[in-house]
């Protein structure tokens, strides 16, 4: 069974990153990105369910895109 709350936390973290980017706040956006990435790695270490792995890989793609945006802000 997928741990929905964990993914909700990740979604909230991603939303915070997006808000920081919207406010041109590269420093906080980057710090939050590191935090969310670590949470994602943690999840990855503790799952072997296909559904969760698919969800995690979506977040990884999203975080990579956000990282590019943060870099372009700096």
Residue ranges of model-derived segments:
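N-terminal acidic leader/helix
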Residues: 1-32
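Short, charge-rich amphipathic interface segments used for partner binding and complex assembly
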Residues: 32-68
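Charged low-complexity stretches with an acidic bias
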Residues: 3-10, 18, 53-74
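Secondary-structure edge/capping motif, primarily at the C-terminal ends of alpha-helices
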Residues: 14-25, 43-47, 70-74
